[in-house]
Amino acid sequence: MLQRAGKLYVAHWKAFRICKKNEFASITNDATLKSVCLGPPQNDPKGLINRELSRLDDKVAKKCVKAGVTPVGAQFPGLCTGASDATFADCVAARVACRFCQSVNRADAILPPLNCDTFDDGVSNASCSP
């Protein structure tokens, strides 16, 4: 699970880098960087993020649910502990998106920073603090 979550995090960065490279001429400030490459939803021209999301879903289904390791969330400490088997991968994906958002805000010194609370799961629900 940790390996798949790590690969999803890397996919977020790769998609961001590809977008910045492809849209370099049109990105003139932080506002256009956010709207063009970060959304939400994040621009993913090669489908890297969706591919890793599918792999994470498959990993949960094959290695945990089919193996009888349920509830999956109870096996992992943290914010996803209470997630059902069906929503566990989505919860992990939201946590990864939150960490990516916080990291990209710092790494690119984005001002004003991207709202990570809406970036992680599309909802303003205090699930990702700055």
How should these model regions be labeled?
Residues 1-130:
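Soluble, non-transmembrane alpha-helical interaction regions
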